Amino acid sequence: MAEMKESPTVAPAGTFERRVPEGDSQSRLVCRDCGFINYENPKVVVGSVCTWGEQILLCRRAIHPRSGYWTLPAGYMELHETSADGARREAWEEARASIEIERLLAVYNILRLSQVQLIYRARLLSPDIAAGPESIEVGLFDWGAIPWQDIAFPSVRWALDHYHSAAGRADYPVGSNPPGEWGNYEPGL
């Protein structure tokens, strides 16, 4: 295995080249001057299926991609927070919703975007919700009223379906991508 170099304080533009470091099998960004390897890793997305009784919280996106489409409160995990703390933060940022995390619902791998999504099952502490800066509007939906044709991403549909199939069960298995599905959608929409 190649010797691990410490991160340079500031790497001047253009000093990294893409190559397979000695002892590795993947193409990496390697500093030409010091040999530091800048590992590019998947991004972690955290979110939750939040409920108030039988109703599910959805947020209509005010940002791209998929502006105007409905999603779960979710977003990128921040440094120095747990995944559950990130899911709580995202619920507040997108829907001004205070939630109690109940249990991990699903883990999805979105290969095209190099994402790992951790989706929790959560309970709203109050039905008082409001659109945050990244949402046009928010709403509580009965299962039959979910705007399925306007769902933003395949993983949102998967999470909702898994939540519905696990409803009332404490021992449900953690969900994952449906066989052969990797979360592709039309990014230009």
Show which residues each predicted segment covers:
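Hydrophobic alpha-helical segments
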Residues: A74, A87, S114, Y120, ...
